[in-house]
Amino acid sequence: MIKLTDSLIVKYLSKEANLFEKEELNYLISKKKNHKLFKNFTYTNYLSLMSFNNHDLDKGKRNIYNRIRLIEKRNKLERYKKYAFAASVIFLIGISLFNQFNFNETKITKESIIIGSDKAVLTLENGDQVILEKGKTFQNKTFNSNGKELSYSIKNRSANNPSNQKIVYNFLTVPRGGQFSLNLEDGTEVLLNSDSKIKFPIKFIKGKKREVELLYGEAFFDVSTSQNNNGSEFIVSTKTQKINVIGTKFNIKAYDEDDIVTTTLVEGKIKVQNGESQVLLSPNQQSKVDTKSTNIDVLNVDVFQEISWINGLFSFNDTSLENIMQTLSRWYDLKFIFKSVNEKKFLFSGVLERTKSIEDILFIIEKTSSLNEINFEIIDKVIIIE
């Protein structure tokens, strides 16, 4: 009985396999269990692949370390840098592996899809709107922005606002193809993903709860503790749930088109409420709230995968192509069409960078499909999957 061996895979990837060995490998990896073994081997033998591609192992290592240092400089959340490092290496593994195969290229009729960037619209209490974007600064009596984040002017930060002061709200809207950071008056940091909108007060009132509302979309919260704010509790509301926070880090995903609102706790403790139902979450747990009921399900999750977007990454683990395309459509501001239901069910696992072009992302996904079962065609800002 013919078996799939490491040496056969190595020969193939190093382009040393003869015609008979290539035919043998193709036959073996057509079997489901061997196909999985083949993928696992290539992912865990990255340095070997680098030597095949570059014929210089030390140079390959240096390239990885340089890439890691670049990511480290970009990353705001120190606690999760190690995950970004690992993900960067995984992405390079994919590139090294998939370039070995000969597949049909993604068809592009017109290149008009651009990578997402820092941009948002600030709606002031009087209805005026301010465009915030990379390379453009803004400042008024209350706020200032460097084009990447919106912060309160230092002179306007105050923990002693009168309890009888009227609460005035602003809105920050991040369009499709964008992301933006918001630093609230109490020191809480919020990172908004594409196609998201948050309602927040200009000032929190002394002795009252600190409340914000995620109207739709996805946001990561790093909440300033109650101890630093005269014991005031922090509350985040969505259309279906309310989250009570003491001081913690968590992610909420609540897009209008989704039937499930997910809340993932990274650090601390939060209480999730949906009608009369409520649960307490511990780190590495996620709540799922059905928008059509009062049920709250709790499960353990891989935190890195759930918050990979804040590190500039896409992380997919046996994710359906339908869900992947939904994620990509928000970041690249595009539309997509499936020619049949079968393509929607295709599963993909991998960690990719959000700074890559849509063509690069689709290339990787396409190359993981056996027998060319997935093909993409780009027409203007529409991706057709067949």
What is the meaning of each model-derived region?
Residues 1-8, 22-26, 30, 34-116, ...:
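Membrane-interface anchoring determinants
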Residues 7-11, 23, 311, 347:
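Positions in alpha-helical segments
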Residues 11-14, 188:
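A short, ordered amphipathic alpha-helix with a cationic face
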Residues 13, 17, 32-34, 332:
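Short alpha-helix boundary/capping elements
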Residues 13, 26, 52-56, 316, ...:
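A general boundary/transition motif marking the beginning of the first structured unit of a protein
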